[in-house]
Amino acid sequence: MQSILSSLDKRWRRGGSRMPQLRWQTCLFITINAVIISLLLLDGPVGSGGIAPAIRRLGRALTDFGASGWLIIVSAFLLFEGWATLRVVKSLKTRMQALQICWTGAYLLTSIILSGVIANFLKRTIGRARPQHFEDYGILSFSPFSGHAGFESFPSGHATTIGAFFAAFSLLFPRCRILFLACALWLGMTRVMVGAHYPSDVIAGLALGGWFSLMIAIVYSHYGLLFKTDLDGWPVPKRLLQA
């Protein structure tokens, strides 16, 4: 463990790349406005039961693909499979591939788990009532720290996981970025289709997960792990021989 920490410290000191200009204030402003617009225009119709049965069935068929459990298991498998392979193989190329797989699993794990912890803390702190309680409480009812799942709607934990997972893959495979972002939007909105969340919950969750994956990628790029930084300081995937 000491050798790992020492290696990471050396990588951090060696990484002299500058941080990207994130313009987080602008992005936060856009996200907040998207949430408010969704709350005003979309949350009411969703809460009043304006979702067709066919759409609900579609949502139920797809929504579990965004569950954190299996994504964490797959990520952990990549991490430990890469680590185990690294310990037994001798070929330099194979070791580099194993190291890449190991760090990919670690990146996905940190992005999904830590963003999920934040989302769950926010859900319990805010305590927004879910759509199932719309008739009794409307769209703006809050019961912080109630300990009841029916009052843990904002932000969507599923959407946070989905946002983190697909944002991570967008950064790892930038050529497929549009496809991954479309998948994130569709899977996130299945939470609305099944009546578990309002659209504003999903928008906030997707944004939280996506931004968290970007932050983790920036940290990894500064250490030279899995990512490198481009001329503007943004994380881009490293080629295998650069790992």
Kindly give the residue locations of the regions a language model identified.
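Small-polar-interrupted transmembrane alpha-helices in polytopic inner-membrane proteins
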Residues: 39, 110-124, 179-191
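Membrane-embedded catalytic cores of phosphoryl/pyrophosphoryl-handling enzymes
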Residues: 13-20, 84-85, 137-243
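N-terminal transmembrane-helix/juxtamembrane module of multi-pass inner/ER membrane proteins
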Residues: 1-80, 124-126, 130-146, 243
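Alpha-helical membrane-inserting segments
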Residues: 43, 118, 122, 212-220
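Alpha-helical transmembrane segments of integral membrane proteins
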Residues: 24-28, 99-111, 176-179, 204
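Alpha-helical transmembrane spans of integral membrane proteins, capturing the lipid-embedded, hydrophobic core
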Residues: 29, 33, 108-116, 206, ...
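Interfacial segments of alpha-helical transmembrane regions
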Residues: 86-120
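Membrane-interfacial segments
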Residues: 50, 82-93, 122-130, 134, ...
